[in-house]
Amino acid sequence: MASTTVAQLAAELSRSAAALLEQLQAAGLGKATPEDIVTESDKTRLLDYLKRSHGQADDSARKKITLTKRETSEIRQADSTGKTRTVQVEVRKKRVLIKRDEAGADQHNEAADQHALAAEAAEQARREEEERQQAAELARQEAEAKARREAAEREEAERRAKQEALEAEQRRQAELLARKAEEEAAAARAVGEAAEDASRKKAEDEQARVAVERAAAQKAADDAKAAADKARAEQDAARKRREAAEAEARAIQQMLNAPARVLKAPSERKAEEKKAEQTGTLHKPVKPASATATEAKAGDKKPAATTTTTTATTTADKKGKTGKPGSWQDDSSRKKGSGLKTRGDSSGGVGGWRGGPRGRGGRQQHADDGRSNFQAPTEPVVREVHVPETISVADLAHKMAVKASEVIKQMMKLGQMVTINQVLDQETAMIVVEEMGHKAFAAKLDDPEALLVVDGEEHTDAEQLPRPPVVTVMGHVDHGKTSLLDYIRRAKVAAGEAGGITQHIGAYHVETERGVITFLDTPGHEAFTAMRARGAKATDIVILVVAADDGVMPQTKEAIAHAKAAGVPIVVAINKIDKPDANPDRVKQELVAEQVLPEEYGGDSPFVPVSAKTGAGIEDLLEQVLLQAEVLELKAPVDAPAKGLVVEAQLDKGKGPIATILVSSGTLKRGDVVLAGSAYGRVRAMLDENGKPTKEAGPSIPVEIQGLSEVPAAGEEVLVLPDERKAREIALFRQGKFRDVKLAKQQAAKLETMLEQMTEGDVQTLPLIVKADVQGSQEALVQSLQKLSTAEVRVQIVHAGVGAISESDVNLATASKAVIIGFNVRADAGARKLAENHGIDIRYYNIIYDAVDEIKAAMSGMLAPEKRETTIGQVEVRQVFRVPKIGAVAGCMVTDGLVKRNSLVRVLRNNVVVHTGELDSLKRFKDDVKEVKQGFECGLSIKNFNDVQEGDQLEVYEITEVARTL
């Protein structure tokens, strides 16, 4: 292309060169002289500048081109008259072409360039970050290597220091021995010189002795030196062994860290093998060319079978380059069936050969030459086994990495027959683990109850506010506990109780002028031990009620023990002081004997004489209780989820499970989700002790709640949880855990139970089904009935529950032939009718000791009667007659008592019993008689005994059965 100068362009445009130069410079083109070259791009830029300077925009017509196309056609169409007409049809098509904006394209390209630059910058930053991380990793590895080197150097320095100290000690011992020998030699020389004038012979003897001692000293020094050399040699040997072990460990680590071998092409493999043959190794040195040629010739032939491992390995090496797996030559050699044809490799695979099935050589494979011959030590692996509360035999074997049959064998050795799916309890499983050489730990895994601890810790920082004291009234039966509470509460509970005794634990709160007090009334009967223990567990202060006319009784002592075990203070209320025979001083002395000291004797228990009948001393008693509470400084969080204790629980036919809750901390509200043992639910209704609805209950306030899934066990802890799903999960977990633990313990005790039944023999059992109104009464009644069991008659509680007697209870009694006991409950109409049809005995009681007495009487009737022997007469044989077909007939005289027909007799000869049997016949003269009295003669014969002699004495007796009692 010909170049154009400024002057030529000015001539073409009919302008002066100076004016064109001014315009070029204004357009940003550095043209100074008319001889400067003007390119096409310069012309374009100049044209754009001139357009902008004159205000001319780009012509839109040049960017937008419209193409119009017309097509004309004819259509023949008939009209209504039948004539054909020709219609001209014109079709117009319009197409618009828009030129793309170059500026927009440039902007797009610029954006793309910016994006590419940003991506490149990000990639560069990532690379720099990776380099920094690699540098940090290298620095960390170098620091670790340096630390290891420094530790090794410190260890080596310590070892050298110890060795030098040992050598110094040995040198010092040798010097001491040598110095001692020299001193002894000097002393000997002095003695020899002194004695030389006296006797030369004596001097010679002395010199000989000194020589012997010197030899002994020299020998001792030599022995010490030899011992030092031996110790040094042992240290060197130990150091060498340690270094060898470390080197071997490093080699093993390098082998484990080495990259995996990959299959290579045959040419690469041959080159490597050729190089290896030229270099050689420690175990396979370089062979001369003649030996290599000999081996190559020998490799063309089939190798002979041999029985030694070395020959087999050498032959495998001579086979050429087809020994490695993964090569094509190896596949062809396998197809041809070439290879060693032996009956088996006695080396156990050390030579690298594995025989095929049935000894065929075609399936043999040569092992990889790079495989190490190192074998790990076969020491037994001791595992740490975490054993849950219940575990099956299969799961236990899996945890120990052994087969289940090994665990079953071990259990058989321990004397227990198990199956692979049998569930073991934690104690048995831990014994098996220890017996098999592993370490057993009690596991607490996957326990949803761990969530309760976390939830409880979240509310520990709540504000602690004072709370009312919880006071438990305890004492012996009929000492006036409930009457005392009735006077305080201005109520009459005792009058409505069956038999005048308390059989339920009651919770009340009383508002006094000095504050609120919560009372727990416990039964005093001996059967309610667990109920009293629960009362002591939930209490802050114990009021011990002792009757002034009765003194300390067994349940009084038990209440003292419960209070001391719970660590709560005791306030003694000496009741019934209004009686004429009241003796408070005697009560004090008896309580002092039980380690309950009054304050006037220097103790810490206030004694208050009261009368529940007249109300004397009640105010003083409440004042002492509040004083004790003030000393204890009882506080509890109020604005927190509630916690409490199940005081009592029962099953109502219309309301369902009902639980009496004593709130210990927090506030229980209606609608809260509660968890009590294995029972859970949402609080649907909440009543106070008077049966009035309430919306919330604070600390130390007793309430009755409804809405639980089942009747909770009395004494269970009550918690409020945030959602019902978590409560249901924990409740189901507790139910399953209780069921699994119970089942596992039953299985573990099967063998023991079997042995007990074998030793017991035939034992009478009295099956019972117990239904009570509340949980505490049912628990107390069951415990009292089970205590009645003896070695001959055993009480079997088939089922115990809370609520009315239902048809399912009657069906269970029919199947188990049991007697149903209802304590403060009745059977519904359907259950009564079903019991009459099946003849099931249902007994109703409302006083616990009435039930215990009747069951005791029934058990007495089941006892086998006692047989007692009573002597009724003595007979003397005077003469013996031998009667054919009858045998011996004794003529006798009744000397004492009387003789009855068919009586039992004992034949005594010289006061020795020779026969015990029964009379066959009894006659007086020729007549059969029923009995013969003292002083009369009679004739008699004994069944199956004819050796009656004159002078024998017959002792006549009878056995009577006497009914026994428990």
Curated annotation (Swiss-Prot):
<feature type="compositionally biased region" description="Gly residues">
    <location>
        <begin position="346"/>
        <end position="359"/>
    </location>
</feature>
<feature type="compositionally biased region" description="Basic and acidic residues">
    <location>
        <begin position="266"/>
        <end position="277"/>
    </location>
</feature>
<dbReference type="InterPro" id="IPR000178">
    <property type="entry name" value="TF_IF2_bacterial-like"/>
</dbReference>
<dbReference type="Pfam" id="PF04760">
    <property type="entry name" value="IF2_N"/>
</dbReference>
<dbReference type="GO" id="GO:0003924">
    <property type="term" value="F:GTPase activity"/>
</dbReference>
<dbReference type="GO" id="GO:0003743">
    <property type="term" value="F:translation initiation factor activity"/>
</dbReference>
<dbReference type="InterPro" id="IPR027417">
    <property type="entry name" value="P-loop_NTPase"/>
</dbReference>
<dbReference type="Pfam" id="PF00009">
    <property type="entry name" value="GTP_EFTU"/>
</dbReference>
<keyword id="KW-0547">Nucleotide-binding</keyword>
<feature type="region of interest" description="G2">
    <location>
        <begin position="500"/>
        <end position="504"/>
    </location>
</feature>
<dbReference type="GO" id="GO:0005525">
    <property type="term" value="F:GTP binding"/>
</dbReference>
<feature type="compositionally biased region" description="Basic and acidic residues">
    <location>
        <begin position="123"/>
        <end position="183"/>
    </location>
</feature>
<keyword id="KW-0963">Cytoplasm</keyword>
<feature type="region of interest" description="Disordered">
    <location>
        <begin position="99"/>
        <end position="382"/>
    </location>
</feature>
<dbReference type="InterPro" id="IPR015760">
    <property type="entry name" value="TIF_IF2"/>
</dbReference>
<dbReference type="InterPro" id="IPR023115">
    <property type="entry name" value="TIF_IF2_dom3"/>
</dbReference>
<dbReference type="Pfam" id="PF11987">
    <property type="entry name" value="IF-2"/>
</dbReference>
<dbReference type="GO" id="GO:0097216">
    <property type="term" value="F:guanosine tetraphosphate binding"/>
</dbReference>
<dbReference type="GO" id="GO:0005829">
    <property type="term" value="C:cytosol"/>
</dbReference>
<dbReference type="InterPro" id="IPR009000">
    <property type="entry name" value="Transl_B-barrel_sf"/>
</dbReference>
<dbReference type="InterPro" id="IPR004161">
    <property type="entry name" value="EFTu-like_2"/>
</dbReference>
<feature type="compositionally biased region" description="Basic and acidic residues">
    <location>
        <begin position="197"/>
        <end position="212"/>
    </location>
</feature>
<dbReference type="InterPro" id="IPR000795">
    <property type="entry name" value="T_Tr_GTP-bd_dom"/>
</dbReference>
<dbReference type="InterPro" id="IPR044145">
    <property type="entry name" value="IF2_II"/>
</dbReference>
<feature type="compositionally biased region" description="Basic and acidic residues">
    <location>
        <begin position="220"/>
        <end position="249"/>
    </location>
</feature>
<feature type="region of interest" description="G1">
    <location>
        <begin position="475"/>
        <end position="482"/>
    </location>
</feature>
<protein>
    <recommendedName>
        <fullName>Translation initiation factor IF-2</fullName>
    </recommendedName>
</protein>
<dbReference type="InterPro" id="IPR036925">
    <property type="entry name" value="TIF_IF2_dom3_sf"/>
</dbReference>
<feature type="domain" description="tr-type G">
    <location>
        <begin position="466"/>
        <end position="635"/>
    </location>
</feature>
<feature type="compositionally biased region" description="Basic and acidic residues">
    <location>
        <begin position="99"/>
        <end position="113"/>
    </location>
</feature>
<feature type="binding site">
    <location>
        <begin position="475"/>
        <end position="482"/>
    </location>
    <ligand>
        <name>GTP</name>
    </ligand>
</feature>
<comment type="similarity">
    <text>Belongs to the TRAFAC class translation factor GTPase superfamily. Classic translation factor GTPase family. IF-2 subfamily.</text>
</comment>
<feature type="region of interest" description="G4">
    <location>
        <begin position="575"/>
        <end position="578"/>
    </location>
</feature>
<keyword id="KW-0342">GTP-binding</keyword>
<feature type="region of interest" description="G5">
    <location>
        <begin position="611"/>
        <end position="613"/>
    </location>
</feature>
<comment type="function">
    <text>One of the essential components for the initiation of protein synthesis. Protects formylmethionyl-tRNA from spontaneous hydrolysis and promotes its binding to the 30S ribosomal subunits. Also involved in the hydrolysis of GTP during the formation of the 70S ribosomal complex.</text>
</comment>
<dbReference type="Pfam" id="PF03144">
    <property type="entry name" value="GTP_EFTU_D2"/>
</dbReference>
<dbReference type="Pfam" id="PF08364">
    <property type="entry name" value="IF2_assoc"/>
</dbReference>
<dbReference type="InterPro" id="IPR013575">
    <property type="entry name" value="IF2_assoc_dom_bac"/>
</dbReference>
<dbReference type="InterPro" id="IPR005225">
    <property type="entry name" value="Small_GTP-bd"/>
</dbReference>
<keyword id="KW-0396">Initiation factor</keyword>
<dbReference type="Pfam" id="PF22042">
    <property type="entry name" value="EF-G_D2"/>
</dbReference>
